[in-house]
Amino acid sequence: MRLILLGAPGAGKGTQAGFIKDKFNIPQISTGDMLRAAVKAGTPLGIAAKKIMDEGGLVSDDIIIGLVKDRLKEADCAKGYLFDGFPRTIPQADAMKEAGVAIDYVLEIDVPDEAIVERMSGRRVHPASGRTYHVKFNPPKVAGKDDLTGEELIQRDDDKEETVKKRLSVYHEQTEVLVGYYNQWAASGQPGAPKYRKIAGVGPVDQIRDSAFAALAG
């Protein structure tokens, strides 16, 4: 099972990716995770990427493709893989094609912008553990405090409302074109063309998971 998850930032791709990778026993290749690890380690790549992400921009194709190519060489990708947050642009999608990266399915998770702004701007994180809360959907027992340690929660820079809206604008301008790109490729009947599936990403998490599994079964 080799697939790409498409959808706006905050559409729930990461959550559904977790369910899919467990069901099919494949690694989730998240450029966000790879970038955050680089930021945390303070590598030159990480420092450059943090500045771009904090401003709501997209990290350059060269940086991302370099990370992805290295990742696909690892042994756990032999049976398949799940891309979450990649490709984000037509040049990245073309680079994947040229590199011979096989894709069986492209799954789009569709969520309205207003729902995404509410989801993301309400996130709060405990920096030391990575535990995540939401002021409305999953609040801590004490407002602004981690349940286990009582330490302060923070709002990540890329979860602030202004940044979320900018990221959505960037998504609509640069990444949404991939919906058409993969739809056309899927409809072309060309050898190696993936199947394209679209599901609604609003509602109970389990319901969205079941929709995703059903989409990947046909």
UniProtKB/Swiss-Prot annotation:
| Quaternary structure and interacting proteins, as annotated | Monomer.
Protein name per UniProt:
Adenylate kinase
Return the GO cellular component terms, semicolon-separated: cytoplasm
Residues that bind ATP: 10-15, 123, 132-133, 203
Class of this enzyme: transferase
Organism domain of life? Bacteria
Q: Which gene encodes it?
A: adk
Native species? Janthinobacterium sp. (strain Marseille) (Minibacterium massiliensis)
The UniProt annotation puts the region (NMP) at: 30-59
**EC number(s) per UniProt?**
2.7.4.3
